[in-house]
Amino acid sequence: MPIFNELKLAKELMRFPSITPVDAGTMNFLARKLRSLGFKCKILEFKSKNSKPVKNLYARLGKARPNFCYAGHTDVVPPGKLSDWTVNPFKPAVKKNHLIGRGANDMKASVACFVAAVSKFKSKKFKGSISLLITGDEEGIAINGTKRVVEYLKRKKEKIDFCLVGEPTNQNKLGEMMKIGRRGSITGYLTVCGVQGHVAYPHDANNPAPVMTKILNQIENIKLDKGTKNFQPSNLEIVKINTDNTADNVIPGEVTATFNIRFNDRHSSNSLKKKLNNIFRKACRKSKCSFKISYMVSGESFITVPNKTTRMIQNTIKKITKIKPKLSTSGGTSDARFIRKISPC
């Protein structure tokens, strides 16, 4: 059985230009490496209406329980202007003891480290199984990735007892933090509709712009909560305001705005929708405007209550890095929001 070098394997993975949702051969390469270690691998390709097909991989070594799973992704975000890079982002290089290239941080190097660790560990006798859930749809719209793999595993009655999500977590020092939950995320797309008219004849129009500004001011200043034991306070941010006006002397017929809320376990997406819709309804009724609202829920908040597995991981990190990681729920969403439906993570 081969033993893999983590740096060499990371470089090999990073050479694939797997800009989400393009696979570029990454999953087949990774499956070959895992099969050489004795893993049984299943490449799962999913597609949805108006989206490109996405390759995913579920690999398992052993049949016994507990089944310890590592979750990650091999898709990366676009590299942007190549002239801004000191190296070709898909020709990784080590400079001043740093691995540079797309995926070095998020998160091909993490995948490589776990696979390399397993290649060294598997010669030992251990109880249970080791599995990997790797997607090619984490950086994009995330509808044909981990979410679909979880649905597949549920249908197959595949049991995962604990899942370690290998996303980058530490901002300053390696080992300083591990995530035991995430805030929920909901995005709102609001349109306030009035009556278009000429600015010289405002009595013949109904300007939705002041109504929208009042609404946005109100929701931006809402104190949703003061935070909870495991979560920071929920927060709403306005991210976009727009009208379709192309002239300076026209009162717009409608105004659109987009906002996002990162919320803790004091709320659900449904409770927030109800609260917000009441605000929109009252404001528009008073102004004789109307409104349209749609929402996209990226995930609900969740928490994995610290247990013997989280403590074992915490102690192992401290042993290696000399830092005891803080247990946190900060930051953005991750695919843990899907995996939590079948396993603590």
Q: Predicted regions: what is each one?
A:
Residues 67-131, 155-156:
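Active-site metal-coordination/substrate-binding segment of hydrolases
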Residues 1-80, 254-258, 272-275:
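N-terminal helical capping/dimerization or prosegment-like subdomains
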Residues 41, 59, 92-94, 238-241, ...:
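A structural signal for short hydrophobic beta-strand segments in well-ordered beta-sheet cores
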Residues 19, 75, 139, 169-170, ...:
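Catalytic metal-binding/acid-base residues of hydrolase active sites
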Residues 1, 36, 169-173, 180, ...:
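Metal-dependent amide/peptide-bond hydrolase catalytic core
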Residues 45, 134, 295-297:
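Residue-level recognition of beta-strand->loop/alpha-helix junctions
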Residues 109-118, 122-218, 228:
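Fold-level recognition of mixed alpha/beta catalytic cores in primary-metabolism enzymes, strongest
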Residues 42, 69, 131-133, 292:
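A structural signal for isolated positions on well-ordered beta-strands in alpha/beta enzyme cores
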